[in-house]
Amino acid sequence: MGLPTVPGLLLSLVLLALLMGIHPSGVTGLVPSLGDREKRDSLCPQGKYVHSKNNSICCTKCHKGTYLVSDCPSPGRDTVCRECEKGTFTASQNYLRQCLSCKTCRKEMSQVEISPCQADKDTVCGCKENQFQRYLSETHFQCVDCSPCFNGTVTIPCKETQNTVCNCHAGFFLRESECVPCSHCKKNEECMKLCLPPPLANVTNPQDSGTAVLLPLVILLGLCLLSFIFISLMCRYPRWRPEVYSIICRDPVPVKEEKAGKPLTPAPSPAFSPTSGFNPTLGFSTPGFSSPVSSTPISPIFGPSNWHFMPPVSEVVPTQGADPLLYESLCSVPAPTSVQKWEDSAHPQRPDNADLAILYAVVDGVPPARWKEFMRFMGLSEHEIERLEMQNGRCLREAQYSMLEAWRRRTPRHEDTLEVVGLVLSKMNLAGCLENILEALRNPAPSSTTRLPR
């Protein structure tokens, strides 16, 4: 048995075979392609197009702002173009038969006109300040106010086509670029993840670990700061705690503090007796400067037969020269005294009172304006100068004597006082002061009253 035949089926198959055998160019010729126009333009160089009726002719395109009226009649001839009328435009070279209509900014979309339509460009529409463009389609947009980020902070500011990006504070969540209170959050919404507080353990542990690290550091820094302030005050004001001062500052206790328990008037030294030639409590004036150290002769009163002119340091008794209470009357009420001198036969060696007279003569011989400079040359530190000044703030003369006495205690015993003083005064261009000092030691001028301190 053969296959059943359907009337007309054979004829349809034959026609289909004939169509498949036809060349593809013939098929495409039946349906014009969308890119025909571009293919035709590609046959001509840039800036020209194919004549609409003669494919062998390439005509020049019309400039922007114009449109095509008629093609060029022949190669090398100009195309006939005409300028666009008001309300129309062409934004590039073209061979359009008519210009494009200008668009209008839509007020219902809150659009504003940025620049008007011209023959060579379309109208430019935009938004007002603090607005952005929300596109409803590829060409249509609506102007929307930028979010002010209330109850939050601005992460990314508002741009031309993008709203503000906000970071909401605690207790708020982000909904359509606005921070909304968590009280408006309903169950089974995405905001529940943002509004629910984190687990208690996650919050507590970091705080505990941070506190455990920071608290000891804060306590340690506080103790260091208090210790520094305490040491600074003790070194600055040593009268407060003399024992602590001597331990911390590694400096001997100030002389006044050491001798505070002694009587106001110390007993006279066995090597010293009142005479009419010398009084250690008196100051000696220094009228001027004249000669160096070596050129000044020594008076017989202070010669080697009477006392050691420059005794060793170990023979100096600090209590005789350093205690400012002995000379407190010089800073308060003038008291008449008699002139004293040495006795040769009873006491052959009197180094303590001799140094006392020399130191007071130096105090009176150096100008007060250059006293600190003098003591720096003698080797006293700035700290010690200030300390002795504060201890003897009531009397400048006693402060100067305390500085000299402190220097004398630390001077090697083989160095004598006047020789060192003379060298220092020479460096300071005050060598003449030594002559005045020696003159005061040779001839102490008797007076009825003690000279007031400077």
Swiss-Prot record:
The chain crosses the membrane at residues 213-235. Its main location: membrane. The keyword Transcription regulation does not apply. It holds the Pfam family TNFR_c6. It is a single-pass type I membrane protein. SUPFAM superfamilies: DEATH domain, TNF receptor-like. TNFR-Cys repeats lie at residues 43-82, 83-125, 126-166, 167-196. Residues 30-212 are extracellular. GO terms for biological process: aortic valve development; cell surface receptor signaling pathway; cell surface receptor signaling pathway via JAK-STAT; cellular response to mechanical stimulus; cytokine-mediated signaling pathway; defense response; defense response to bacterium; extrinsic apoptotic signaling pathway via death domain receptors. Residues 1-29 form the signal peptide. Glycans are attached at residues 54, 151, 202, 376. It is found in: Cell membrane; Golgi apparatus membrane. (Microbial infection) Glycosylated at Arg-376 by S.typhimurium protein Ssek3: arginine GlcNAcylation prevents homotypic/heterotypic death domain interactions. Binding of TNF to the extracellular domain leads to homotrimerization. The aggregated death domains provide a novel molecular interface that interacts specifically with the death domain of TRADD. Various TRADD-interacting proteins such as TRAFS, RIPK1 and possibly FADD, are recruited to the complex by their association with TRADD. This complex activates at least two distinct signaling cascades, apoptosis and NF-kappa-B signaling. Interacts with BAG4, BABAM2, FEM1B, GRB2, SQSTM1 and TRPC4AP. Interacts with DAB2IP. Interacts directly with NOL3 (via CARD domain); inhibits TNF-signaling pathway. This is Tumor necrosis factor receptor superfamily member 1A. The gene is Tnfrsf1a.
